[in-house]
């Protein structure tokens, strides 16, 4: 039990320290999504595990509204699409959670050339979401805020010809 005021871990480490296949898969995800370390991946896996656990609990209950609220919440943050239901939560993968990170959305929207550059733009305060500056690459972008991504007005990156911009002409 953690003492009040002390941080607790928000993730679980793998049970076995060396499994070659798992390590190769984690390394691939780290490079594909521009994650800093495996802790970020383990956090996403723990978040997904919590979603699945909640879905299993809600599937066991009958006649509750909380299942619909849970699905609506996952649809708001973009992990589930509009037509998916509570059963579909069990088939989610860690990539579904990683795709909703601000760092990934900035890259997918074409504001950065690479995932690493997207991470740098976010952590250096060049990106705003819904008009407010967000400096956490792990921020989960709701679907409603996805089209409000932009460079900060005070950033040099607002210039279309800035050399660091994606697709900048030289």
Swiss-Prot record:
Domain of life of the source: Archaea
Keywords assigned: Ribonucleoprotein, Ribosomal protein, RNA-binding, rRNA-binding
GO molecular function: rRNA binding; structural constituent of ribosome
Covalent S-S links between cysteines: none
GO-annotated biological processes: ribosomal small subunit biogenesis; translation
Function: One of the primary rRNA binding proteins, it binds directly to 16S rRNA where it nucleates assembly of the body of the 30S subunit.
Summary of subunit composition and partner proteins: Part of the 30S ribosomal subunit. Contacts protein S5. The interaction surface between S4 and S5 is involved in control of translational fidelity.
Keyword rRNA-binding: yes
Domain S4 RNA-binding: 100-164
PROSITE patterns in alphabetical order: RIBOSOMAL_S4, S4
Family indicated by similarity: Belongs to the universal ribosomal protein uS4 family.
Signal peptide: none
UniProt gene name: rps4
Name recorded for this polypeptide: Small ribosomal subunit protein uS4
CDD domains associated with the record: S4
HAMAP family: Ribosomal_uS4_A
GO CC annotation: small ribosomal subunit
PANTHER family named in the record: 30S 40S RIBOSOMAL PROTEIN, 40S RIBOSOMAL PROTEIN S9
Keyword Ribonucleoprotein tagged: yes
InterPro entries: Ribosomal_uS4, Ribosomal_uS4_arc, Ribosomal_uS4_CS, Ribosomal_uS4_euk/arc, Ribosomal_uS4_N, S4_RNA-bd, S4_RNA-bd_sf
Pfam families: S4
């Amino acid at each position: 039990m953690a003492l009040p005021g002390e941080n607790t871990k928000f993730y679980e480490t793998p049970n076995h320290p060396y499994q070659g296949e798992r390590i190769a898969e984690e390394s691939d995800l780290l490079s594909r999504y521009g994650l800093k370390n495996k802790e970020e991946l383990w956090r996403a896996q723990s978040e997904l595990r919590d979603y699945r656990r909640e879905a299993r609990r809600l599937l066991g209950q009958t006649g509750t509204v909380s299942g619909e609220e849970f699905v609506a919440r996952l649809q708001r943050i973009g992990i589930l699409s509009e037509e998916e239901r509570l059963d579909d939560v069990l088939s989610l993968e860690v990539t579904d959670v990683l795709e909703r990170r601000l760092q990934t959305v900035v890259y997918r929207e074409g504001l950065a050339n690479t995932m690493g550059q997207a991470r740098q733009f976010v952590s250096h305060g060049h990106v705003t979401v819904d008009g407010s500056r967000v400096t956490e690459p792990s921020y989960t972008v709701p679907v409603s805020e996805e089209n409000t991504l932009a460079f900060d007005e005070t950033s040099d990156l607002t210039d279309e010809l800035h050399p660091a911009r994606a697709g900048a002409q030289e």
